Each structure stands twice: as structure tokens, then as C-alpha cells.
């Protein structure tokens, strides 16, 4: 409680009361006017409201932006942490996004991945939310974090032999050609460039694709 004693009567122009040196975690309350009259007590109430935030996290593929192969940006589990304490968990939707509920602004909020979505490697990065109270002036605030992940990759190796049916001896087939493509694409021509490959077997009957994103080929 703050009181002002022996204040001169305001007359037609009221006094203005403002809060100064408000703690940074609070919204600065609006100024109020206060007329001062003879032998009357004028009362004004100020309420300190904590600044709050929500954060929208958007996950994308580190190389392409959108999901590659049969990998998915949906289903990744992230945690929001206060210091080193896990406060809540959230799961990415089909767009690789989630939005948190409101929390009190502070400088030690972070986002961390707990479980990656299908076809992606776990991201070990600790992402600062950007919820420092000095960044905001109002009660309800929104911030955003973009996070990226690396898709799993692998290759396919083939060894081709022939058997003339008489000797029963398998012979490496030099020059055998194979088209490899992501099954869900439907055909070789429909597959993305990084989701298909052509291999030609060498003199040992061996052929190997380039590294391709997670999926069934």
C-alpha cells in the first residue's frame, strides 16, 4: 500500500498516478487519474499481472523442408523444460507443428526432442524458447521456434549371379541393370530424384545404390 499525504487539491485537472520500477516479469499497469478533493480520500488500485507466453514449434526436414521418403514429420515427442525440469510433453501434428499452453515468461525455458518421428534421427539440440520477460510488454504473448531434423538414409546392395543349369556353378553377371525406387511412389519415373537410382552390376555381379532416404524400395 502506498499513500500520499497532504496533497494539494487537484481542481479541474486530476493527478496522474503511474507505477514506476515495475519488476520486469510483470506487465506495467496503465496510468490512472485521481482527483483530489477537500477532506476526501481518493483510492486507486493497481494490479500486477505476470507476462505469459505460448510457443509454436515447427519441425522440418533439414535437407528438403518437407518429409523425405516414407519418413514423417508427425508424431515426434517434444518436451518443454523449465531449467532442467520437464514440465510438459507435446506431439507434432501432420504439419510437424504443435503449440503449447501458456507459461510464465522467464529466461530458462527450452524445447527438447524426446522421441523422433518415423524415419528421423533424434535431434539433441536444446532450443531456447525466447520467452525472456524483457522481450514483452503485454500479458499474453506468442513466440515461435523452427527446428530441423536429419532423415535416416541407407543404400541397397545387390549381387547378381547366373547359372546355366548344367554346371550348377553360379557366375557373376557383369552388366546386369536394376532400377530401384521408393515403393510408395508407384513407379521409377514418379519417384523423386533422391528416392530412385539405377545400378549396373560390375564384374563381380555387385551393384550398390547411392544413399536414399528412409522408406521401402
Where are these regions (language model features)?
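Solvent-exposed loop/turn and edge beta-strand elements of beta-rich ligand-binding domains
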Residues: 1-217
